[in-house]
């Protein structure tokens, strides 16, 4: 617990240092309004990264969420184009996202195949389905479906009490997932499943039901992100979530989640989302090409994984030495 809070404080300090450093290069980075409203460019990554944290804590992984976003976006456009009222179209899109998550969970549970392999397969399945629906809508390739009502396209660009709507939705998701993972019995079950699935099963923990809930929440969050992105850009495209995979997983791991399961932090992930998002924006404002920005995000992920692995092994060695000191061999 102490280590987790220490890591979160370190991330928060690093976030402040990052903003100040980029502010020295470009003073616009120090403008509060710019910092708040620029989150709309990347905060949907955070909306997906929060439930993804819980999936990884449980010992699983889901790399299909980017394709789920694209599929849900195209489905929303196709529903609207077919004359379905916008509120109903949004509801059906959210249900589709949850269904995609349940498909992942069902395949993982009943085939016992590694979640990485399953979600790699569904990544291509959902991406192909999105392109198929795009063709049905007459939007060839990565062309978008437009013509949405102004009330919908304005939604993601509104602000309430000085906060952009996407950021408000992210904060609501943050509160809900933090309470669920860290303050409920069901959340404790997620940690136990990640630490030892076999022990959790023998302890009468509903492992399969919990996994279904986690993957469904990730799919639902992907659908929420899709709706916000379509509203923000005013266009439904099958590639809307294509660039989400690397920054989302980087944020989860940087936030303190063990990639093998058993530990993680919703607050840590939230701070890491801002850290990664502002890193990319700061580099762009400094004139750094997007390719270099992506490479730095990948390098950051590698450094964090290696650093946490070294830290974990050092802690294990210290504990082993302490046990040896307290119980010397005869």
What is each PLM-predicted segment?
Residues 1-20, 195, 202-209, 283-330:
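Cytosolic-side transmembrane-helix boundaries in multi-pass membrane proteins
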Residues 25-37, 131-137, 156, 181-187, ...:
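Inter-helical junctions in multi-pass inner-membrane proteins, predominant
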């Amino acid at each position: 617990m102490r280590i987790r809070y220490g890591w979160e404080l370190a991330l928060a300090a690093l976030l402040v240092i990052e903003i100040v450093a980029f502010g020295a290069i470009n003073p616009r980075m120090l403008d509060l309004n710019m910092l708040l409203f620029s989150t709309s460019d990347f905060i949907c990554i955070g909306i997906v990264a929060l439930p993804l944290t819980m999936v990884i804590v449980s010992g699983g992984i889901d790399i299909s969420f980017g394709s789920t976003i694209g599929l849900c976006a195209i489905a929303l456009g196709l529903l609207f184009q077919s004359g379905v009222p916008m509120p109903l179209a949004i509801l059906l899109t959210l249900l589709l996202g949850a269904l995609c998550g349940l498909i992942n969970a069902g395949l993982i549970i009943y085939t016992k195949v590694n979640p990485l392999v399953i979600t790699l397969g569904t990544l291509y399945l959902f991406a192909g389905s999105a392109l198929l629906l795009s063709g049905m809508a007459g939007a060839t390739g990565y062309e978008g479906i437009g013509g949405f009502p102004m009330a919908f396209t304005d939604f993601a660009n509104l602000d309430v009490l000085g906060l952009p709507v996407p950021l408000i939705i992210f904060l609501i998701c943050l509160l809900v997932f933090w309470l669920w993972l860290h303050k409920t019995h069901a959340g404790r079950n997620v940690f136990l499943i990640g630490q030892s699935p076999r022990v959790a099963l023998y302890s009468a923990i509903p492992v399969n039901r919990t996994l279904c809930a986690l993957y469904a929440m990730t799919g639902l969050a992907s659908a929420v992100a899709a709706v916000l992105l379509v509203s923000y850009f005013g266009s439904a495209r099958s590639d809307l979530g294509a660039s989400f995979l690397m920054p989302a997983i980087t944020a989860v791991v940087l936030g303190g989640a063990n990639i093998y399961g058993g530990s993680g932090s919703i607050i840590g992930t939230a701070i890491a989302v801002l850290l990664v998002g502002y890193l990319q924006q700061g580099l762009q404002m400094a004139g750094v090409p997007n390719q270099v920005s992506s490479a730095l995000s990948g390098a950051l992920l590698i450094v964090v994984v290696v650093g946490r692995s070294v830290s974990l092994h050092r802690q294990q060695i210290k504990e082993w030495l302490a046990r040896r000191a307290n119980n010397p061999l005869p």
